[in-house]
Amino acid sequence: RDIVLAMAASTTSGINNSRFINADYAPTADFDLLLKAALYAKEKGINIKAGNVLSSDEFYEDDPDFYKLWAKFGVLCVEMEAAGLYTIAAKFNVKALAILTISDSLVTGQKSNSIERETTFQDMIDIALNIA
């Protein structure tokens, strides 16, 4: 399973646009946590990707090709929490890093079953526990 370290989080949500009075806010990870996670993964031989992710209000979009525009701009995956996590972390001046394991692929259509979801996320957990 691919592991993604979310450097930043774009969003389809309007919450930050509302919060920042019609302006765009770019929520980002804490650099120290990101660096520690990347270095730990490299040391342990865990393959990771680091980059921008998309926080979407809808996990299952009506348009199966909606991700293609985001992918063209280098967005690595779609999830639902990173933009909110990073925005609140910035508001309260705390560190945050979203570490994600790809469970379902919009590109290939591959989906994890419930047993895989329970048993194949160990590398992500290992990274998180060792950088905290």
List the predicted regions and their residue ranges.
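Glycine-rich phosphate- or other oxyanion-binding loops that anchor nucleotides, phosphorylated ligands
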Residues: 1-132
